[in-house]
Amino acid sequence: MHIQQVFDAAWTEGLSLPLGEAKAASQTVALIDGMDFHRQSDKDAVAHAYQERQRTRVYESLNVRSDGWFSTVTLRLTAIMRHQVICTAYESHAGDRNLGAHDDEWLGVITQMRGAKRWLVWPETTGAPEEIVTRVGDVLILPQGVKHEVSTPDSPGYSVHLVFAITDELV
């Protein structure tokens, strides 16, 4: 389910995120290329690895490794859903390598924070995918096990989205 403009775009873009130079020292960043995840925590090492081969940067377990409003949102969602929730940030540019088509083992509540993201979603196991473009302030609910593939459109050429992954683990 794609819900457009849940949050005001200017307000959403104004929210601080600990990415790039602002990332916490303990925050691990995975650079993904297919099923290859190259993890780094040093800012300079992340920048160097990205320059060598442009890949989507994944800030895993952001709610645990960094402080900010997203940690509070994660705790509130955990309390409401009564399931463990994990917040992860995905940062990419047009042309960055990524996971390719895959499915996830959690219910994803995805919030587009910066730029835009193109999603191909296969609601059925057979048939053509549905194309969805999320823009700043949009929310996409992606059920567990639904096959999808993402890319960053040439315009604006940049994307940051948060995934609040609602797991099967009860709390």
Regions found by a protein language model. Give the residues of each.
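Conserved beta-strand-loop-short alpha-helix elements that form
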Residues: 141
